[in-house]
Amino acid sequence: MRTRFTLAALFTAVAVLLSACGGGGSGGDSDLAQVKDAGVLKVGTEGTYSPFSYHDPQSNKLVGYDVEVAAAVAKKLGVKVEYVETPWDSIFAGLTSKRFDAIINQVTKNPEREGLYGLSTPYTISEGVIATRANDSSVTSLADLKGKKTAQSLTSNWAKVAKDAGAQVEGVEGFTQAVTLLKQKRVDATVNDNLAVLDYQKSTGDSSIKIAAKTGETSQQVVATRKGSDLVAAIDKALADLSADGTLTKISQKYFGTDVSKKA
């Protein structure tokens, strides 16, 4: 999920703090009233982050889990949605400069972001898992990785999780390559976010790998708004309604084959 804290994010943090010192808060006048008056909720999203926000190869239409969540939230607010495609490294700067009203792009909740932005209740809950070949019953816990080989992107936090568990880590470029090595029996497992595994299984229909165990790590993905924005309460209400009426579950099932809007 989207957890990186880049130089661009540092500049954004400074801008937010300076705005707060100016006395008016970064939310300013009622953001909700402005959205209602305009009849549009402007949403910052990448458009290059499958299966959350990406362009369908056939139609080139912007689609994805987060794209549909954004549309559903806007509908609950009684407005249309307008997507503002923005690279991840500048997406928070775009929010601060009011290019859009909210970010819906798998923003992971953490203490730094809680201090800088208005964050909604979670609409996605993900967890670390260990994927193995479907016919391998030797891994049932994180401790079972000791002495085994795992395929990991060396810059990811999952590589550290595997190493700390005593695994021998082989570097790969991403999850797809990790699965290839796993199926070729060149490694015993790969540690990753459950959403990556579920997306792979749903999009490929490949039943040769399975989720064998959980790492115990979870993360929550939220909608980000400007600090002090009254949109947070309205979005929270919309998300609660979407959870209650089954919309979030339906969208989750479409993209992942299971409900990722709630903790399993």
Describe the function of each predicted region.
Residues 28-104:
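Extracytoplasmic small-molecule ligand-binding "clamshell" domains
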Residues 40-45, 142-154:
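Short loop->beta-strand "edge-of-pocket" segments that line small-molecule binding or catalytic clefts
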Residues 67, 83-93, 137, 154-156, ...:
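Short helix-initiation/N-cap motifs at beta->coil->alpha
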Residues 15-20:
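C-terminal motif of bacterial Sec signal peptides marking the signal peptidase cleavage site
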